[in-house]
């Protein structure tokens, strides 16, 4: 890798495009295997040899019933779990076993979504100038971005950025990065890929760590890809969304409420019961800062692509902001059909929103 440094005025004149980045194509993919949420508690406690934990099983059944999730697509199968029983305990050493699957499945699933986006885009794959890849599933080097470059046959000169362990915020963060790359590199076409495989967090129940049950109920596998660029070529590229601005913020003193740690037992998950309240208490301040420059203060006048961290978050945000029932419909539909897809989730919702818009001719 090499970097050439030029005087500031040269680089601004030569490379920057004065305009907003646009999403030019979207693609999504899921594993063929899927589980029914109503029967999953029976499967989960059977495959983890935990059927004797009757109270725990009933609690898990209640969590699944309240989740408003109908099904989830998963790479893990009963065959895989039977071959690797260390995945079915709570804290047995299993990182190597998980990595063996994740390092191949994450880029493979990412390729499926990327190919769909590239097909919709309709331009030669050689015109992709940048690749931004993110996953919370496993860590490897060379990374999943490198593996995807080979799988797709991208130019060896493609500029790559790999983001690991960014969690649910990563989908929106990848759009922000793609916007910056596209607007600061004239003619750039940025391929963004988010690919998630929840094998990293699957494990048996623990009587001491009950929030583990939430992870087993909530997350699904999937990948999503978008192509971002400026100055779409008339007749050759069709812009779907315009990325006008982006921002990110931290709610102070909340880092202990939502945590994932990569350990010998895999990726552990902790989520406090305060998370929905923390989000709803702060969401309107973020909206005001984002939309005030555009004179927008009616939250029902805009379309919504809200990451569904869980049904409780959607309910509370809707109530707090006085949103009509259709405003978060796409988020609820994606949650129902796929579960929480971590980084890929907002891109699945983005895809659903544009498809519904096209169908309704809006």
From Swiss-Prot:
An example molecular function term from Gene Ontology annotations: naringenin-chalcone synthase activity
Domain of life: Eukaryota
Recorded metabolic or biological pathway in which this protein acts: Secondary metabolite biosynthesis; flavonoid biosynthesis
A UniProt-annotated Pfam family: Chal_sti_synt_C
GO annotation (BP), single: flavonoid biosynthetic process
Active site, UniProt feature: 168
Keywords of this entry: Acyltransferase, Flavonoid biosynthesis, Transferase
Enzyme class, spelled out: transferase
CDD domains membership: CHS_like
Known EC number: 2.3.1.74
Swiss-Prot/TrEMBL catalytic activity: (E)-4-coumaroyl-CoA + 3 malonyl-CoA + 3 H(+) = 2',4,4',6'-tetrahydroxychalcone + 3 CO2 + 4 CoA
Family designation: Belongs to the thiolase-like superfamily. Chalcone/stilbene synthases family.
Function as written in the Swiss-Prot or TrEMBL entry: The primary product of this enzyme is 4,2',4',6'-tetrahydroxychalcone (also termed naringenin-chalcone or chalcone) which can under specific conditions spontaneously isomerize into naringenin.
Entry protein name: Chalcone synthase A
Organism: Ipomoea platensis
């Amino acid at each position: 890798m090499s970097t050439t440094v030029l005087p500031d005025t040269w680089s601004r004149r030569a490379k920057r495009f004065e305009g907003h980045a646009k999403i030019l194509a979207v693609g999504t993919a899921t594993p063929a295997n899927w589980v029914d949420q109503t029967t999953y508690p029976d499967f989960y406690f059977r495959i983890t040899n935990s059927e004797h934990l009757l109270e725990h099983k009933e609690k898990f059944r209640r969590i699944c019933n309240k989740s408003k999730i109908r099904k989830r697509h998963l790479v893990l199968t009963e065959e895989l779990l039977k071959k690797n029983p260390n995945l079915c305990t709570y804290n047995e050493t299993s990182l190597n076993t998980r990595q063996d699957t994740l390092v191949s499945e994450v880029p493979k699933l990412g390729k499926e979504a990327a190919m769909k986006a590239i097909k919709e885009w309709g331009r030669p794959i050689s015109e992709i100038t940048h690749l931004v890849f993110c996953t919370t599933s496993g860590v490897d080097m060379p990374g999943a971005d490198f593996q995807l470059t080979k799988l797709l046959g991208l130019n060896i000169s493609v500029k790559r950025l790999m983001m690991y362990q960014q969690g649910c915020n990563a989908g929106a963060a990848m759009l922000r990065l793609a916007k910056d790359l596209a607007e600061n590199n004239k003619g750039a076409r940025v391929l963004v890929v988010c690919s998630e495989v929840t094998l990293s967090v699957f494990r048996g129940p623990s009587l001491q760590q009950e929030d583990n049950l939430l992870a087993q109920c909530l997350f699904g596998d999937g990948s999503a890809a978008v192509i971002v660029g400026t100055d779409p070529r008339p007749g050759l590229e069709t812009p779907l969304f315009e990325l006008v601005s982006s921002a990110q913020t931290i709610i102070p003193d909340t880092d202990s409420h939502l945590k994932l740690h990569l350990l010998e037992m895999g990726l552990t998950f902790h989520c406090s019961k305060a998370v929905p309240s923390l989000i709803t208490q702060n969401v309107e301040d973020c909206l005001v800062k984002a939309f005030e420059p555009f004179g927008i203060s009616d939250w029902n006048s805009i379309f919504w692509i809200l990451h569904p961290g869980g049904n409780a978050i959607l309910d509370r945000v809707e109530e707090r902001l006085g949103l009509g029932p259709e405003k978060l419909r796409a988020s609820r539909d994606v949650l129902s059909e796929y579960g929480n897809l971590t980084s890929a989730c907002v891109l699945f919702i983005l895809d659903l929103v544009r498809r519904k818009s096209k169908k309704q001719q809006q």
